[in-house]
Amino acid sequence: MRHNNSGRRLGRTTSHRIAMFRNMVTSLLNHERIVTTDAKAKEIRSVAEKMITLGKRGDLHAHRQAAAYIREKSVVTKLFSTIAPRYKDRAGGYTRIIKLGQRLGDAASLSVIELVEEAAPQQS
C-alpha cells in the first residue's frame, strides 16, 4: 500500500528525479517559461515556488539554500535581484501551468509552466 506517499516517481530513480527537478527549476527561473509534460510541470511547480519564496526572504541563509539547489550562479543572482522583487506583494502562486495538447511522437500531454507576469505599474 502506498498510503501517505506523495509525489510522482516519473519512472526514474530518486537521484535521477532530483537531478531532473534541479535542472528544470534552473531552466524555468532562467527562461521564465518551459515546455514539459503535465506530470513534470506539476511536480516542479512546488519546488519553483519554494525557490521564489527563498528569494523573497533574501537573507544570507536563503541565498545559500537557493544556491545549493539551483545549478547556475547567474540564475541565483537573477532570482534574488529580478524575480523575487517582482513578487514582493504576492503571497504564493508565482507559476502557472497551461496545457498544450499532446506530443506527436508519443502522445504525452504537454504543458507550459511559466512565471506569472506582474502587471507593470501604470504611469499617470
Curated annotation (Swiss-Prot):
Signal peptide: none annotated. One of its GO terms (molecular function) is structural constituent of ribosome. InterPro entries: Ribosomal_bL17 (IPR000456), Ribosomal_bL17_CS (IPR047859), Ribosomal_bL17_sf (IPR036373). The keyword Acyltransferase does not apply. It holds the Pfam family Ribosomal_L17. Belongs to the bacterial ribosomal protein bL17 family. This is Large ribosomal subunit protein bL17. It comes from Trichlorobacter lovleyi (strain ATCC BAA-1151 / DSM 17278 / SZ).
